[in-house]
Amino acid sequence: MTTTVKRRARIGIMGGTFDPIHNGHLVAGSEVADRFDLDLVVYVPTGQPWQKANKKVSPAEDRYLMTVIATASNPRFMVSRVDIDRGGDTYTIDTLQDLSKQYPDAQLYFITGADALAQIVTWRDWEKTFELAHFVGVTRPGYELDGNIIPEMHQDRVSLVDIPAMAISSTDCRERSSEERPVWYLVPDGVVQYIAKRQLYRPEGSDKDMDPKGQNQA
């Protein structure tokens, strides 16, 4: 009689400001899920990103709702409020500790941009994060992570995945929206409508209503 051993669940964790979430984030989640045979990808909007303490960031609820809208059509995607509800500055170590408690039997894969991964030694309790997850750096084709950045003892816990759509950036999407230039096909359709409805990313002092139909113009 053959005994089937059930493998541990594999869960991707993608943390980010998502201001706004764009198609590059979604393609990255899908590609990493396929590459590592993930059962689920959890998108985690930050509460207060510590790296952006002096920068203007959209309200957490707006960023959360845009992420929910963007991921709703993919049954392998879900959104967690764990960082928002915790309050205070968001640190990856806290995210991973909280989610490892929610999924105690799962193998976690933390998905982040390779440029952010290159700064990992500046993160709070960064060495402990390797005990909780395998790190996946998503990047544009041709990018190479400096081998000296990640200590040798942790290099087997890091993988890079090329994502062509990572050329899209949230910064560019915000700038285009503030100038009333189209962001269709850069962010999901529902997010385009949400940005227009909530009048996000308008210039300071602007009292001009954004025209959601204008986002249709090429």
From Swiss-Prot:
Catalytic activity: nicotinate beta-D-ribonucleotide + ATP + H(+) = deamido-NAD(+) + diphosphate
SUPFAM superfamilies: Nucleotidylyl transferase (SSF52374)
Top-rank EC class of the record's enzyme: transferase
Gene3D superfamilies the UniProt entry points to: HUPs
Taxonomic superkingdom: Bacteria
GO MF: ATP binding; nicotinate-nucleotide adenylyltransferase activity
One Pfam family of this chain: CTP_transf_like
Pathway(s): Cofactor biosynthesis; NAD(+) biosynthesis; deamido-NAD(+) from nicotinate D-ribonucleotide: step 1/1
GO biological process: NAD biosynthetic process
Record's keyword terms, sorted: ATP-binding, NAD, Nucleotide-binding, Nucleotidyltransferase, Pyridine nucleotide biosynthesis, Transferase
EC number: 2.7.7.18
Database matches in PANTHER family: NICOTINATE-NUCLEOTIDE ADENYLYLTRANSFERASE-RELATED, PHOSPHOPANTETHEINE ADENYLYLTRANSFERASE
NCBIfam families associated with the record: cyt_tran_rel, nicotinate (nicotinamide) nucleotide adenylyltransferase, PRK00071.1-3
Function in brief: Catalyzes the reversible adenylation of nicotinate mononucleotide (NaMN) to nicotinic acid adenine dinucleotide (NaAD).
Annotated family: Belongs to the NadD family.
Protein name: Probable nicotinate-nucleotide adenylyltransferase
Provenance organism: Corynebacterium glutamicum (strain ATCC 13032 / DSM 20300 / JCM 1318 / BCRC 11384 / CCUG 27702 / LMG 3730 / NBRC 12168 / NCIMB 10025 / NRRL B-2784 / 534)
